Regions:
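Extracellular zinc-dependent metalloprotease catalytic-domain scaffold
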Residues: 1-88, 93-225
C-alpha cells in the first residue's frame, strides 16, 4: 500500500476511530514531500472535558480524550464518532497544519497584516469556497488564521470567527471583510457540524503534499457550513 499515514495502536477500543480517520486521510492525500508518517495513538482518561485531543508534532503521537468515546458529531453532513473527527484534525496537525511546517506561510503578530496565511493554494481555495457560497472575493488576498484563545489554538488553526469571550468576531483586513467558515475541520474547535473543505487541501498542497480535491471527503458546501 502507498498510504501516506499509518497508525500504531494497541488498544482495540479505538480501532474504529483509527480505521475511519485513515480511510479519509489517505483518500484525500496521495503523496508526501518527504516521508510517510507513522503515528502512535492513545486514549487518555485524564483530559478535561474541554480538551478532545492533543498531538505532538515532535514525536508523532496523538492522545484522545477517553471520556468522549460515546459522542457523535457530523462531518460533511454525515454522522461520525467524535474521536474519529478529532483524530483527523490531530493527524493534520502532525502533517504540519497550520504554521508547524517551517515554510513561513503564517504571519503572526509581527506580520503586516497580522494573523494571516499567505500560501498560494490555501488562499486560492479559500477564495473558491467563498465564491461558491456567494461571497465577493474581489479584494480577498489572505486567509485568516486564529487570533484568539491562547497557546495551542492561536495561530495554529484557521479562524473560528469568535473572540476570546466566545462572542462573534468578524475579521476585517485592510478594511475588507473576510468571511470565515467557522466549522472547517482545521479551526480551533471541533463542533457538532464539521466540514473538510478545499482550504485544508490547499494548505497541504502548499506544504508539498499531493492532494485529491475530488475526494468524496472534501466539500465546499454544506447544509450547516457556517460563515462569520
Amino acid at each position: 500500500m502507498n498510504d501516506i499515514v499509518s497508525i500504531i495502536n494497541n488498544d482495540p477500543r479505538i480501532e474504529l476511530y483509527v480505521l475511519t480517520a485513515l480511510r479519509i486521510i489517505n483518500n484525500m492525500i496521495k503523496g508526501s514531500p518527504n516521508k510517510k508518517y507513522d503515528i502512535k495513538v492513545y486514549l487518555d482518561s485524564s483530559m478535561s472535558d474541554d480538551i478532545l485531543g492533543v498531538a505532538s508534532v515532535y514525536t508523532n503521537e496523538i492522545w484522545l480524550n477517553e471520556n468522549k468515546m460515546a459522542d457523535l458529531v457530523l462531518l460533511n453532513d454525515v454522522d461520525y464518532n467524535l474521536l474519529s473527527v478529532v483524530l483527523i484534525h490531530e493527524i493534520l496537525h502532525i502533517l504540519g497544519m497550520i504554521g508547524m511546517d517551517g515554510f513561513g506561510l503564517v504571519q503572526g503578530e509581527e506580520g503586516i497584516p497580522q494573523n494571516v496565511y499567505i500560501g498560494k493554494h490555501g488562499i486560492e481555495h479559500y477564495k473558491s469556497i467563498l465564491s461558491e457560497n456567494g461571497f465577493d472575493i474581489a479584494n480577498i488576498h489572505y486567509l485568516p488564521i486564529e487570533n484568539n484563545f491562547g497557546e495551542g489554538t492561536h495561530r495554529t488553526h484557521l479562524e473560528e470567527g469568535l473572540d476570546g469571550n466566545n462572542e462573534i468576531e468578524k475579521r476585517y483586513i485592510d478594511d475588507v471583510y473576510y468571511p470565515v467558515p467557522t466549522n472547517e475541520i482545521m479551526t480551533g474547535f471541533i463542533n457538532k457540524y464539521n466540514y473538510i473543505t478545499p482550504i485544508t487541501l490547499g494548505i497541504l498542497e502548499d506544504y508539498g503534499f499531493k492532494v485529491d480535491y475530488d475526494s468524496i471527503y472534501v466539500t465546499s458546501v454544506g447544509k450547516r457550513l457556517i460563515f462569520i
